[in-house]
C-alpha cells in the first residue's frame, strides 16, 4: 500500500495517526516529503543529519526507531529503513534510499515500532533540528552550516569536526 494513501486516510469521524514521511538518498537529498504530524521537513537542502533517516544507511535493511526532540521541545517517534531502488537496465547498479516515517510522541502507544523504546528516558531522546541553517543547537557536533538567525563566531585558531564545530 502506498504511504501517501495511508497518511491521507483522515476521516474526521475516525481519525488515524497523523504521520510524517520522507525519502532521502545517500547524499542527503530529500526526494519525497509529507507531513501531517507537525514536524517541519525542509523544502530545500537536506534535513538535520541527526535524523535517523540518515543513520539508517549505516545499517541497511534494519528498521531503526528513535525518539526525536526538536529545538522547540516537540517530540516525535520516528522509524527509518533503507530500501533499494532498481533502474531496470541490465548491469545498472541499484540506488539506496532511506524511508522515514513518524508521528508525535503522544501517539507512540499506537505505533507498533515503539514497543522497545523507553519513552520516559530523557537520555534516549535524540536532539534534532530541521536543518543546520535553522537550528538553535549551537553545540551540535554535526553542524555543517552556520545558523542564519544567530551570531555564530568561527575560531580560525581552533579545529573541530567541521568549521562550525569547535570541541
Task: Tell what function each PLM region has.
Residues 11-39:
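Extended amphipathic alpha-helical segments with heptad-repeat/coiled-coil character used for oligomerization
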Residues 19-21, 34, 57, 111, ...:
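Phenylalanine-focused residue identity feature
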Residues 9, 140, 145:
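Residue-level marker of positions within ordered structural domains that often coincide
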Residues 1-5:
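Conserved small/polar residues in nucleotide/adenosyl-binding loops
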Residues 143-167:
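Short microdomains enriched in Cys/His and/or Lys/Arg
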Residues 39-142:
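Low-complexity, glycine/alanine/valine/leucine- and proline-rich hydrophobic stretches
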Residues 9-13, 57-58:
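Short linear motifs in intrinsically disordered
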Residues 21, 76-77, 165-166:
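Generic ordered-secondary-structure signal
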